[in-house]
Amino acid sequence: MKMEELVREIERLKEERNAIIMAHNYQLPEIQDIADFLGDSLELARKAVNVDADVIVFVGVDFMAETAKILNPEKTVLLPTRRATCAMANMLKVEHILKAKEQYPDAPVVLYVNTTAETKAYADVTVTSANAVRIVEKLDSDVIIFGPDKNLASYVAKMTGKKVIPVPEYGHCYVHRQFTLEDVERARKLYPNAKLMVHPECEPEVQERADIIVSTGGMIRRAPEHDEWVVFTEREMVYRLQRLYPDIKFHPAKEDAICIGMKAITLNHIYESLRDMKYEVEVPEDIAEKARRAIERMLEMS
């Protein structure tokens, strides 16, 4: 089936199923073009609370679809392929949290939304890269257990002055970890008039040389501050920014900064998922109830 026909069929099925397509900023351009709502993790979580549809087709990785289901237990949530997983989310296990709580029993557990539903059930509050600093600042504790991204944990510690215990100690996003000081130097030489926008999942030494450190939603909000940027995050964010601001120049810091989990979903997967109503996301209610409290607390504190 040609792309134009595939898009028409997806639109037809959306109407027939009363469905909405929610997609993350890292999705393929052709998916961004058909999404009803595009955003970062925080924006998608907020949107999921007020979705006016019977079916949510979540075009992101599995933990995002789980979050949508947790916030919409009565709706059908579809993840178009089971291969859309997040390696970092799977690094954090319940045992890591319990071990940290033994050592720091009074410390609140703050978990990145990039975690499984099972681990979210042990969180006092969840955060995204967009609101992590603000939420940790509001917590009445100088010691925080934070997982799973060690680089975001380091950034939060630096910005808040609090003691942040990373769980696990090796948690990271492989896409953002690959950005190096050499990439910073190359960007400065290639684009001398550009500023560098860097995601807080990047290594601390890369963050230190950034002009701004922001989530993907923050990149969108702050892009108009300058006329040329080098973007240190997943490659497809450049497409999103360029669509929004055609008069501003955006360059990917690395052409091969690709999230395999995000790229696992194609238009054909979306079509087949809607056609057959397959790959429905389910979260056991006992886990969902506990995780929901942590997510809703995040939304209240944001």
Curated annotation (Swiss-Prot):
Question: What GO biological process terms are annotated to this protein in UniProt?
Answer: 'de novo' NAD biosynthetic process from L-aspartate
Q: Which cysteines are cross-linked by disulfides?
A: none
The chemistry this enzyme catalyses reads: iminosuccinate + dihydroxyacetone phosphate = quinolinate + phosphate + 2 H2O + H(+)
- Annotated keywords: 4Fe-4S, Cytoplasm, Iron, Iron-sulfur, Metal-binding, Pyridine nucleotide biosynthesis, Transferase
Please give the SUPFAM superfamilies that the UniProt record associates with this protein: NadA-like
Which pathway does the database say it acts in?
Answer: Cofactor biosynthesis; NAD(+) biosynthesis; quinolinate from iminoaspartate: step 1/1
Q: Which residues bind [4Fe-4S] cluster?
A: 86, 173, 259
Q: What is its EC number?
A: 2.5.1.72
Cofactor(s) recorded in Swiss-Prot or TrEMBL? [4Fe-4S] cluster
Q: Quote any Pfam family the record assigns.
A: NadA
What GO annotations for molecular function exist for this entry?
4 iron, 4 sulfur cluster binding; metal ion binding; quinolinate synthetase A activity
Cofactor: bound how, per the entry note? Binds 1 [4Fe-4S] cluster per subunit.
Q: Name one GO cellular component term.
A: cytoplasm
Q: Which residues bind iminosuccinate?
A: 24, 41, 112-114, 129, 199-201, 216
For the keyword 4Fe-4S, the answer is yes
Location in the cell reads: Cytoplasm
Q: Which domain of life is it from?
A: Archaea
Reported function: Catalyzes the condensation of iminoaspartate with dihydroxyacetone phosphate to form quinolinate.
Instruction: Tell me its family.
Output: Belongs to the quinolinate synthase family. Type 2 subfamily.
Name of the protein in its database record: Quinolinate synthase
Provide the species name.
Answer: Thermococcus onnurineus (strain NA1)
